[in-house]
Amino acid sequence: DNWLKTIQDSIQTKYPNALKQNIIKRNMMLLKDKPFASYYEQIEKAINRNDIVSINHRISAFMASYFDIIFAVNELLHPGEKRLDKYAKDNCQILPNKFEENINKLLVQPNSETLNILDDMVESLRQILYLGYHI
């Protein structure tokens, strides 16, 4: 029908330059350029206090902004949250130097024990819930 063609046509329009500039400016500020409380600064503070939950939370936010910038630079619509590195490699003509290497170094934590650890965490929660405690 017409509604599908309308959606397809709207997607085929040129990437708005103002949107591109705003995405880049806002997310660069969040990454490190903000005078205080940038993701970089928050990660640094979390590292100094050895707060691994906060480190991972802030790294996730950092990565979201990082990919927002990459897709804006390449004038691509954001594909969602899964396999962003592969999507970027396959579809972006402009990528940061050491793109894969830096991501792999940053996110090296997941390993063969990750699923076992998650299973243990869930089972521990179940034990608490089974005993009638509330989280």
Predicted region positions:
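Amphipathic alpha-helix face/heptad-repeat signature
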Residues: N27-K32, R58-I59, I117, M121
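Long, charge-rich low-complexity segments
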Residues: E101-I135
